[in-house]
Amino acid sequence: MNFIPPQDETRLRAAASGVLPNGKPVVVNADGTVSVAASTNNSQIVGADEVFESATIAFTCSTFDSNSNKVVIAYEDKGNSNYGTAVVGTVASNDITFGTPVVFESATVGNMGPKAITFDSNSNKVVINYADEGNSDRGTSIVGTVSGTSISFGTAVVFNSSATYEIGSTFDSTNNKVVICYGNGGDGAQGYAIVGTVSGTGISFGSAAEYEGGESKYNSAAFDTVNGKVVIAYMDDADSDKGKAVVATVSGTSISFGSIAVFNDAITNYVGIDYDSSSGKMLIAFKDKGDSDKGKAVVGTISSTSISFGSEAEFEAGQTDHLSVAAFSAASQVAVFYRDSDDSNKGKVNMGTISGTSVSFAGAVDITAGTISLSTAVNDTNANQLVFAYKDDANSNYGTANVFQPAYISTNLTSENYIGMSGGAVSYTGSAASTGSAVVYNSGASKFQGAAFDSNSN
C-alpha cells in the first residue's frame, strides 16, 4: 500500500469491508470500515384485509407514532354508541395487527377528516381532534400515549366553543406545535386555525385565527420541514367551490397567513395534502368535478409566505372519492389512496413522483376488491410500508386496513454516510481479506445529494 501524500486532501485511506470496485460510491459503516454502497430491489406488496373494528365505523383518520413505531387509527364506532375510539396497529411481515380498541370520547364524535389526528414528535404524543356531539359539536382535542399495543388518554380540551366542521391537523416540528384547521360554525363555517401546545397528557391553545372568509370544507394540513411552514388546503364553498391553499406561519401560540392561492378553478372535492421531503414540495390531490370527477394532483412550492402551483396531473380517469395522501419517503414518492367509484368502488393507490413543479404517476393498483369509503393513508417510516385504513362497505362496514409497499429500489447511501468514490480495486489475501484492509479512495465532493446507486452495475 502506497502512502498518501500529505498535500493530497482529496484522497483518504480506510479499512475496507469487501471489495471496492473502481469508481463506485463508498459509505462508512457503523464499525468504522468502508464498503461500496448497496441497493435492494423491493417488490410490490399488497397486504391482506385486516379488521380493526368489527362494527360500522365513520370518520377515519390515522397517524404514525415514530417513538413507539406504531400506527394509530381514530374513528367513530357506530357499534358502540358512536363513541370516539382509537386503536394501535403494528406493521410487521407485510401485515398489520391491532391491539384492543380504546374509547377516547364517551359521546358521539364527528367531522374528523383523514388527517384529524397527528403525532407530536417533541412530546411523543398523539393528538386527536374532533367534534364532540355530546358537547354541542364543539371542537375538542385529546392527547394519547401509546404503550405497547394500547393507548391511554388525558383529559379532553375544547379548542372551539362553537360547532366545528371538516377538521384537519398537522405538527409543526420547527416550533413544536400542533396546528388544527377547521370550519368554525360560530362564524359561518369559515376557515380557522389554532395552535396547540402539548404538555404531559394535556394540551393548551392560543387564539384562533381566520384563514378563509368563506365556508371552508375538506380542510387538510401538512408541514414543510425545510421552510418551517404549514400549508392548509381546502375547498372554498363561498367561491364556486374552488380548491385553494394558504401558507401559515406559527409564532409562539399564534398563527398568521399569507395570500390565498387557487390550485383548481373548478368545483373541488376530497382535498388531501402531504409534504414530500425528497423534493421539498407539497402534493395536493383532489376530485375535479369540473372534469368528470377525475382524480387530479398538483405540486405546490412555498416561497416565504406564498405558495405557487405547477400544472395539474391526472391520477385517476374515473370518478374519484374518499381520497387521502401520504408521502412515502423510502421511495421518494407520494401515495394517493382513493375510491374508484367507476370501478366497483374499489380502494386503489397511485404512487406519484415529483420532479420540479410536476408530478407523474406510476399507475393505479387495486388494494381492495370491494367497496370502500372514508379512507385514510399513513406512512410507517419504521417498516417503510404504507397503511391504508377505511370503512369496508363490502364487509358490514367494518373498520379495515391494508399494508402496501410499492416496487422501488432502496439504497444505504445517504448524505451522512457517503465519503467518496473508490479510487481503485485493491487485492488482499489471508486474514486481511476478512478483517478489512486499508484501501485508498478519492473523497471527491464533500456532499451527496439525491442520487441512487444500482449495485447491479458493478
Q: What are these regions, as identified by a protein language model?
A:
Residues 41-410, 429-458:
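Extracellular, repeat-based ectodomains that mediate carbohydrate processing or recognition
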Residues 1-48, 409-458:
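Glycine-anchored, exposed beta-strand/edge motif detector
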